[in-house]
């Protein structure tokens, strides 16, 4: 047994043969668990099973769980690449018993696997137990035959596990492998335990107590088992390696990186190769599970991981994006075990490529500032934390990247001042929000929800109903009544008004009764499920307890229904055209338009957009039934219902299905689910049949942020008006161009080509005129004179663009052979650009950047940039062109 894939299969198959259900790895983004940023252990997906909240159809399970540790207390990021066993991404092998077997069976199964299936020598294995766990101590003697000297009692948290301050807990027992006396270190619990001789390969947790407040522990009625073995560690032991990065999986990835960068895997660039290999896995798996790089939350952690790898790619000498070229090597190694990698391969590649392209610009700016600010520091010094925060806040340079860049020079970052700067910014944001008046208003809803309970929503079945006023709120405080002309928020015991959520806007309408009439302009959901109606009393006085007739604006609701159903259809159509990686990132469903944001790394072509629109309208024309049903969350997921990424769902969810499950094979759209063509978890309102949408017209496609695209669309009458408007524009264009509508594109293309030709001719004419008749500094007809022993060509020209100024300078340098060329171009808006060129033989004496900065200052500008042989700048005052040329001449004189 040698390969990682074989080791993983052996583990899972062993436990399957012993009555365990092989459960697929859960996503890296924990479902319905706000306490965790990422899945970081095998037991995470079984948390509710262990606590009794959730029931599963099995009592024994085994998994190979994807895990990421790169944030919070489990942050291994800084160590990755520099140690033998730190990773941001790793796989946790595990077996679990939910009130079935306990200690004896757990130890027996573990010992049988490591000694029989894995073939590890018994004399190389040592076990630890919690200090007072006599039962486990005796079982290791009985089952494994270990001598007491190799069953070590350990006190403290290392051998006692707790889910939290309260809840299930219990002692642990760990299996260690002894690498032999050639490696420094001592057994667990000894003074030399920090050495690498004894390596933990498996941790068995015996959940046998419930921790209560006050430190009391009661025995659990059904003790359980939770075990975890790091696959990379196990593979290293089985492959005879002392370093996780020497196992077959990492060797293959590092070889792929080395082939592209010509780096030596055993040379001084070893750490960079390892960083990239590790971070490639973390980045790719996070993207495949729906996380995209951003500046907050999980997306920011992903961006930090990606950018750290990209920084090391730059250290290896990569001059163009590298990471995306390595995804194929990763899918070859891990795609069979994790097919989601293969499904999302295109998204992973494009996301990595775009992020690295952007980051290279950030890296250049950030490193330049870092070099400047740390130029006077020496080994052992501290880098200013405020500057580190500026790099983070202004330039997108993560703190760990700053630390990493300074690490090789022995310079540390003042993290305390960095944290202070971060907190000052957060305090400003909190103060701004609190001072906006929103804080007081928001604070009223949670106590009301506790007092009144949830509002019963009737809007799926009806748009008219009766309701009683249970609370009135004005200016953030509860009131007894609202008079005519006053506006406020109204809470009812039940309502047909939909509260804004899931991207769908809130309903509007009218409430009336006993001389009172209220115009409702918005409906919102607060504190989870408290429906709050925003409105103005038009007649009478509205009082607490009033009975009202409630009527939603039917026409507006109808338009919203059509637009909401259209978003579902467009979502599935986008998946059909662009790939399975398409996942919703947000939406807006209003009566007059819809907006849909989704994960996709690049713009959608006109052809792709047309296909999406065609598929969507095929489903509309089918006039298929739209069905809704309530289902258990797990049943809905197993049935293939799509969920909004990051949304929290209860145990029971509403599933909306539309489109025929079995479609005509000649149709543009193909079946995606037995329940329907589009199947999503959704709490919004929808049409009865897809034909009620009428027509879907996509009006725009754009970028929202890195890796997130947006389409906007119209339905029904809005779509028809849009189509008619476009046709009118096409007819008007055809009339203006004296051609037919069908020939308009070809006619425009011909005109654009003619325009390009004329622009080229005009540019050439301007350049000839500029070099032949522009004003020359010093009055020389040719503009060439000698300054400080070198030839200087200095001219001011009119109407020449910056790109043309550069070509003029290049041509003039060739003509001069040796010398300096300076050309100032005055634009029509009064501004000026200046380009300075220095021939190669003179760059040791004259720097084009320094010369151009002197000119820029004369023009009222600041700075300038380029290379020693060619630089450019600009300024707002083109009337000072001659002064700019004189400044260059003076600078040459001083330098000469």
From Swiss-Prot:
InterPro entries: aa-tRNA-synth_II/BPL/LPL, Ala-tRNA-lgiase_IIc, Ala-tRNA-ligase_IIc_anticod-bd, Ala-tRNA-synth_IIc_core, Ala-tRNA-synth_IIc_N, Ala-tRNA_ligase, Ala_tRNA_ligase_euk/bac, DHHA1_dom. SUPFAM superfamilies: Class II aaRS and biotin synthetases (SSF55681), Putative anticodon-binding domain of alanyl-tRNA synthetase (AlaRS) (SSF101353), ThrRS/AlaRS common domain (SSF55186), Translation proteins (SSF50447). Residues 859-878 are annotated as: Disordered. It comes from the Bacteria. It is an enzyme of class 6 (ligase). Its main location: cytoplasm. Zn(2+) binds at residues 564, 568, 682, 686. SMART domains: tRNA_SAD. Transmembrane segments: none annotated. One of its GO terms (biological process) is alanyl-tRNA aminoacylation. It catalyses: tRNA(Ala) + L-alanine + ATP = L-alanyl-tRNA(Ala) + AMP + diphosphate. Its cofactor is Zn(2+). GO terms for molecular function: alanine-tRNA ligase activity; aminoacyl-tRNA deacylase activity; ATP binding; tRNA binding; zinc ion binding. The keyword Aminoacyl-tRNA synthetase applies. It is found in: Cytoplasm. Catalyzes the attachment of alanine to tRNA(Ala) in a two-step reaction: alanine is first activated by ATP to form Ala-AMP and then transferred to the acceptor end of tRNA(Ala). Also edits incorrectly charged Ser-tRNA(Ala) and Gly-tRNA(Ala) via its editing domain. Consists of three domains; the N-terminal catalytic domain, the editing domain and the C-terminal C-Ala domain. The editing domain removes incorrectly charged amino acids, while the C-Ala domain, along with tRNA(Ala), serves as a bridge to cooperatively bring together the editing and aminoacylation centers thus stimulating deacylation of misacylated tRNAs. PANTHER family: ALANINE--TRNA LIGASE, CYTOPLASMIC (PTHR11777:SF9), ALANYL-TRNA SYNTHETASE (PTHR11777). This is Alanine--tRNA ligase.
């Amino acid at each position: 047994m040698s390969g990682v894939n074989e080791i993983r299969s052996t583990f899972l198959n062993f436990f399957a043969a012993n009555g365990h259900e092989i459960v697929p790895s859960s996503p890296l983004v924990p479902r319905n668990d706000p306490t965790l940023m990422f899945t970081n252990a095998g037991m995470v997906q079984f948390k509710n099973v262990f606590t009794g909240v959730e029931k599963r159809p099995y009592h024994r399970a085994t998994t190979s769980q994807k895990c990421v540790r790169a944030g919070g207390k489990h942050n291994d990021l800084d160590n990755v690449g520099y140690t033998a066993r730190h990773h941001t991404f790793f796989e946790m092998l595990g077996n679990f018993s939910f009130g079935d077997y306990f200690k004896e069976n757990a130890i027996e199964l573990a010992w049988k696997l490591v000694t029989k299936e894995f073939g590890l020598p018994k004399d190389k294995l040592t076990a630890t137990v919690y200090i007072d766990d006599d039962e486990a101590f005796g079982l290791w003697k009985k089952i494994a035959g270990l001598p007491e000297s190799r069953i070590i009692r350990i006190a403290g948290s290392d051998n006692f596990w707790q889910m939290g301050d309260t809840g299930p807990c219990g002692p642990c027992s760990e299996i260690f492998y002894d690498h032999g006396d050639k490696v420094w270190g001592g057994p667990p619990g000894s003074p030399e335990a920090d050495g690498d001789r004894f390596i933990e390969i498996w941790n068995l947790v015996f959940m046998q107590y419930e921790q209560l407040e006050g430190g009391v522990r009661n025995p659990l009625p059904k003790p359980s088992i939770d075990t975890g073995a790091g696959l990379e560690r196990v593979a290293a032991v089985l492959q005879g390696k002392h370093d996780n990065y020497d196992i077959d999986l990492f060797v293959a990835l590092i070889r792929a990186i080395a082939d592209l960068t010509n780096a030596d895997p055993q040379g001084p660039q070893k750490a960079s190769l390892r960083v990239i290999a590790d971070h490639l896995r973390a980045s790719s798996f996070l993207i495949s599970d729906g996380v995209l790089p951003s500046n907050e939350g999980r997306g920011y952690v992903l961006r930090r991981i990606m950018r750290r790898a990209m920084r090391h790619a730059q250290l290896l000498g990569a001059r163009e994006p590298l990471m995306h070229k390595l995804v194929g090597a990763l899918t070859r190694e891990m795609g069979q075990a994790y097919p989601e990698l293969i499904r999302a391969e295109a998204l992973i590649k494009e996301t990595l490529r775009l992020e690295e392209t952007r980051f290279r610009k950030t890296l250049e700016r950030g490193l330049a500032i870092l070099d400047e600010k740390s130029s006077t520091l020496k080994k052992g010094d501290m880098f200013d934390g405020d500057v580190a925060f500026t790099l983070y806040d202004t330039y997108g340079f993560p703190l760990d990247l700053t630390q990493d860049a300074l690490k090789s020079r022995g310079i540390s970052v003042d993290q305390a001042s960095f944290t202070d700067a971060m907190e000052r910014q957060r305090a400003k944001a909190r103060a701004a929000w609190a001072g906006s008046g929103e804080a007081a208003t928001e604070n009223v809803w949670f106590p009301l929800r506790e007092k009144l309970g949830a509002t019963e929503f009737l809007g799926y079945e009806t748009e008219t109903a009766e309701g009683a006023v249970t609370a009135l709120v004005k200016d953030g405080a509860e009131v007894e009544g609202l008079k005519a002309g006053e506006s406020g928020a109204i809470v009812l015991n039940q309502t047909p008004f939909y509260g804004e959520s899931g991207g769908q806007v809130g309903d509007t309408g009218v409430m009336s009764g006993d001389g009172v009439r209220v115009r409702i302009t918005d409906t919102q959901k607060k504190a989870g499920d408290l429906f709050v109606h925003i409105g103005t009393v038009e007649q009478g006085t509205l009082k607490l307890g009033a009975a009202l007739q409630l009527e939603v604006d039917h026409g507006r609701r109808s338009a919203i229904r059509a637009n909401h159903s259209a978003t579902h259809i467009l979502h599935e159509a986008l998946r059909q055209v662009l790939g399975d990686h398409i996942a919703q990132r947000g939406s807006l469903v209003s009566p007059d338009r819809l907006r849909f944001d989704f994960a996709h790394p690049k713009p959608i072509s006109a052809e792709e957009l047309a296909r999406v629109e065609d598929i969507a309208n095929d489903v509309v024309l089918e006039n298929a039934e739209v069905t809704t049903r309530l289902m258990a969350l797990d049943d809905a997921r197993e049935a293939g219902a799509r969920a909004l990424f990051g949304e929290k769902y209860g145990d029971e969810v509403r599933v909306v299905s539309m489109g025929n499950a079995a479609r005509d094979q000649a149709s543009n759209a193909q079946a995606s689910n037995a329940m329907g063509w589009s199947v999503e978890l959704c709490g919004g309102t929808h049409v009865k049949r897809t034909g009620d949408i009428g027509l879907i017209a996509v009006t725009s496609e754009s970028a929202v942020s890195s890796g997130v695209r947006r389409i906007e669309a119209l339905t029904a009458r809005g779509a028809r008006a849009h189509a008619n408007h476009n046709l009118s524009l096409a007819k008007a264009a055809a009339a203006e161009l004296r051609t037919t509508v069908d020939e308009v594109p070809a006619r425009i293309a011909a005109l654009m080509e003619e325009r390009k030709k004329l622009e080229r001719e005009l540019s050439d004419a301007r350049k000839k005129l500029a070099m032949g008749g522009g004003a020359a500094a010093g009055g020389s007809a040719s503009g060439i004179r000698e300054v400080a022993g070198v030839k200087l060509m200095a001219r001011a020209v009119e109407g020449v663009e910056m790109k043309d100024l550069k070509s003029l300078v290049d041509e003039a340098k060739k003509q001069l052979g040796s010398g300096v060329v300076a050309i100032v171009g005055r634009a029509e808006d009064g501004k000026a650009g200046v380009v300075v060129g220095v021939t190669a033989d003179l760059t040791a004496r004259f720097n084009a950047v320094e010369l151009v900065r002197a000119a820029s200052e004369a023009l009222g500008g600041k700075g300038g940039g380029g290379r020693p042989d060619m630089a450019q700048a600009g300024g707002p005052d083109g009337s000072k062109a001659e002064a700019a040329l004189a400044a260059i001449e003076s600078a040459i004189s001083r330098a000469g």
